Amino acid sequence: MSARQAAHRERGSRSIGLDAVAAGGVIALGAAFAIGSALRPERKSDPVHRRATRKARDGAAILGASVLMDSAMEHFRGGFHNRAMVLAPATAAASIAASLAEPRPDRTGRLPRLGHALSFAVGAAGLGFHFYNVTKRPGGLSWNNLFYAAPLGAPGALAISGLLGLTSEALSIAPVDGDRTGNEALAWSLPEAGRGLALATGGSLLVTAAEAGLLHFRGAFHNPAMWLPVTVPPATGLFLIGEAANPTDSGREVTRWAARGVAVLGVVGTAFHVWGVHRNMGGWHNWRQTSLAGPPTPAPISFTGLAMAGLAALDALGSEERSS
């Protein structure tokens, strides 16, 4: 067999492999949404409470979907050389299903919490794997390794998805009227759950913006729009942390508009990344190569998921003034 024929066969097998990964990611995404929706019955509760809970859980699900597709593509590019690399997309799918499922009083209610806890644990372990991948290379924590080795903060998105899911669980079971009886005796009140979610979301926005800043710095901020993910989300994260510490009507309204801007930014950023893939040679006609070489298309929508969780936190924080 000639070298040209061998190269052609290798490209063909890789193309088939990427097709399988893409199809598997879509199937896993659809299955996660279907399973989670089936476990999500309508609940009779205060409209504000129900709306805040849905926003928080939908935000965690969107973040999980971003992690599922992004980790599947990036780990495929790495050839899944470590078998543990399969855990990231698999756990992200479980996180989506857990985020869409409503907590129940029976034993089935433990499954969503287990899914969120597993996502957090796998994401935290992934941070260790990626840190080792960066530091084991010549030069250690150098700019070159931070740019081109395993993305240092990427597994944190999976951990954040699990953290938001666990916090949304606390928000979901929070007693609305302040009376804590039975299973709610140890639960947070709705404003307390809102503060916890605001802190978790605010910190997550800061960390996610730092990861985006590193990669956009690698791209030399060649497009002025690349500054938006490193300015708007961190400011919103600080606003959320401030509201968690000292909630006010005026501050909450400013933070709400900032969070809406972050949600829009996630959609616009996805469009920019889709265009970035298109600009590579062959565009989307050559998606098997350009989708791996271009900017990660599933990444920006994570900002939308975090923004929804932030809006849920603001709704819960506002309940304190409405109930007083």
Give the positions of each predicted feature:
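Short amphipathic, positively biased membrane-proximal segments
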Residues: 1-324
